[in-house]
Amino acid sequence: MTEAPTELPPEDRTPPREPGDAWVIEILREIEEEALRHFDPRLLTALGRYIYTRHGDTLEGARELIRILQRALFAHFRAGCGHSRIGQTRGGNPLSAIPTPRGMH
């Protein structure tokens, strides 16, 4: 049996790169689309203006907006959003239809 080769760092010894511009913009569009399903558009517009005044039209501003929207959506889902099963106690376990093995009650 042969051993797997060990993984080596990049030849130029540079640190890992940040995600590319296109990737950040794509993620921002996706998360904004999701946020519009759950939050008032006026709130999102105000948040966007706030980020723009702090960071301008930069990738750092886009990353900050992504971080804030991710946290807001997570908290919203945990609080029991009707569009999500995250954080909901009602409805039961989707695996409950599978019978429990004997002796595991």
Swiss-Prot record:
> Does the record carry Chloroplast as a key word?
no
Regions of compositional bias (Basic and acidic residues) in chain numbering: 10-20
The subcellular location is:
Virion; Host nucleus
Per its UniProt record, what Gene3D superfamilies does this chain match?
Answer: 6.10.210.10, VpR/VpX protein, C-terminal domain
Q: Which GO terms describe its biological process?
A: symbiont entry into host cell; symbiont-mediated arrest of host cell cycle during G2/M transition; viral penetration into host nucleus
Say where the protein is mainly found: virion
Record region (Disordered): 1-20, 85-105
- Has keyword Nucleus? no
Pfam family example for this protein? VPR
Residues where Phosphoserine occurs?
A: 84
Any idea which UniProt keywords this protein has?
Answer: Activator, AIDS, Cell cycle, Host G2/M cell cycle arrest by virus, Host nucleus, Host-virus interaction, Modulation of host cell cycle by virus, Phosphoprotein, Transcription, Transcription regulation, Viral penetration into host nucleus, Virion, Virus entry into host cell
Q: Which InterPro entries does this UniProt record tie to the protein? A: RetroV_VpR/X
**Any one GO CC term of the record:** host cell
Subunit comment: Interacts with human UNG.
Q: What role does it play? A: Stimulates gene expression driven by the HIV-2 LTR. Prevents infected cells from undergoing mitosis and proliferating, by inducing arrest or delay in the G2 phase of the cell cycle. Cell cycle arrest creates a favorable environment for maximizing viral expression and production.
Q: What is this protein called?
A: Protein Vpr
What would be the name of the gene that encodes this protein?
vpr
